[in-house]
């Protein structure tokens, strides 16, 4: 089937999905969860082929980690799908209403966006996340995954199609572009007669491509340097655990810590404990001169001087930038200079300092006394996410069900004519 034919089929499917009852959509999601469990061995075997091919082609450890599916991760995906079933369906809900002077009742009601195109790289879980959230919100989707995940995605798409068949929803509700031809990405980006929104999930190059070529509204997200600032009033003992969690728990995640900013008044005090923990976790520290001297004196085992672009780098690995700053205003100045748009945090016991950071940071998600790792649909109680938007229009942060809807105005009256 040509891409244009897929677009037309998706548009037609979106009309049926828009009026599908919540119970019917939930039935499809439950069938999807059951099929994932039934086909676990097939899915993991397909993923093993992708992992083997990835190693042979020289993929980084960070990319391989994103690509990996195992029993635990698959169980998490199943749980996320079932969580989506329990969430309220935003479609049809009334946002607000009022009665005008002429007697008309005017309201805004949530509706599906229509057809959503999603282009993503080495994350097979995205296939299920997108399908589940789009189905729940009555949106048709056209998916294009990376070649690194081809076998995994083919197995997952079969699961989705089986669930759609069981529940009688259109097969074109969720479609996957199987061809690795990159020209199809450019074609998808210009199919504005059928596709209403494009969501890229991948690196900066993918986002730039979509932004430059698309004639369809694009949700930019996922990429961004995440920072954590340790204020002079912070509990330095407890701070080490938060820094460790933000950097080490899953370094390949887009919400993992990239740059640590230390207030100059506590830098010398916290560095020994920081170095001990980072040495233990095999983290490479990349530091500007003040931080470098302190880290070197404390015995940092993997340490190098920061280059011109290091503080603009999303590491996605066990590497951490470290810088000493004068105060919270200097920390904010650093954030503003270095692409802080995703997840940023402050550790402080000073409420005024915390409030200043919250208001001044331009990030999609800002944390006080917490790890950056919480920027996630499941952690936010959204069930899953289609993306983490770092732009300011339409949606921001983890995009769950509500962010996959628009609204329409509804006027109800008694045979009213305009005077």
From Swiss-Prot:
GO biological process terms held by the UniProt record: L-proline biosynthetic process
Pathway: Amino-acid biosynthesis; L-proline biosynthesis; L-glutamate 5-semialdehyde from L-glutamate: step 2/2
The UniProt record lists the keyword Amino-acid biosynthesis: yes
GO terms under cellular component: cytoplasm
SUPFAM superfamilies with a match to the protein in the record: ALDH-like (SSF53720)
Keyword Ribosomal protein assigned: no
EC code: 1.2.1.41
Source superkingdom: Bacteria
Coiled-coil portions: none
Disulfide bonds: none
Family: Belongs to the gamma-glutamyl phosphate reductase family.
Protein name according to UniProt: Gamma-glutamyl phosphate reductase
Gene behind the chain: proA
């Amino acid at each position: 089937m040509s891409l244009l034919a897929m677009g037309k089929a998706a548009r037609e499917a979106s009309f049926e999905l828009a009026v599908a009852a919540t119970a019917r959509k939930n039935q499809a999601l439950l069938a999807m969860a059951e099929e994932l469990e039934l086909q676990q061995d097939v899915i993991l075997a397909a993923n093993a082929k992708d992992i083997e091919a990835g190693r042979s082609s020289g993929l980084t450890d960070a990319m391989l980690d994103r690509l990996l599916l195992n029993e635990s991760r698959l169980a998490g995906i199943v749980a996320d799908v079932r969580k989506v079933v329990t969430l309220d369906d935003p479609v049809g809900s009334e946002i607000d209403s009022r009665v005008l002077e002429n007697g008309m009742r005017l309201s805004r009601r949530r509706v599906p966006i229509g057809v959503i195109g999603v282009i993503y790289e080495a994350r097979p879980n995205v296939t299920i996340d997108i399908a589940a959230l789009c189905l729940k919100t009555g949106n048709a989707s056209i998916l294009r995954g990376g070649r690194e995940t081809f076998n995994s995605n083919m197995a997952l798409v079969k699961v989705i199609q089986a669930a759609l068949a069981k529940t009688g929803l259109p097969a074109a509700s969720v479609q996957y572009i199987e061809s690795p031809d990159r020209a199809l990405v450019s074609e998808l980006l210009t199919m504005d007669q059928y596709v209403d929104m494009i969501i890229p999930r991948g690196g900066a190059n993918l986002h730039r491509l979509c932004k430059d070529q698309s004639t369809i509204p694009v949700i930019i997200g996922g990429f961004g340097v995440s920072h954590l600032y340790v204020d002079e009033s912070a509990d330095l003992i407890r701070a080490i655990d938060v820094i460790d969690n933000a950097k080490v728990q899953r370094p390949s995640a887009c919400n993992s810590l990239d740059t640590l900013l230390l207030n100059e008044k506590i830098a010398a005090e916290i560095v020994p404990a920081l170095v001990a923990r980072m040495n233990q976790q095999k983290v490479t520290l990349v530091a500007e001169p003040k931080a470098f001297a302190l880290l070197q004196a404390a015995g940092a085992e993997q340490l190098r001087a920061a280059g011109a672009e290091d503080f603009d780098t999303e590491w996605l690995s066990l590497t951490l930038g470290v810088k000493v700053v004068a105060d919270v205003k200097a920390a904010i100045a650093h954030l503003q200079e270095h692409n802080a748009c995703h997840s940023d945090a402050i550790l402080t016991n000073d409420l005024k300092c915390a409030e200043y950071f919250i208001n001044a940071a331009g990030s999609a998600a800002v944390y006080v006394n917490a790890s950056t790792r919480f920027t996630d649909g499941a952690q936010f109680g959204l069930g899953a996410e289609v993306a983490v938007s770092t732009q300011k229009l339409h949606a921001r942060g983890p995009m769950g069900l509500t962010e996959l809807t628009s609204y329409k105005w509804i006027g109800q009256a008694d045979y009213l004519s305009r005077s």
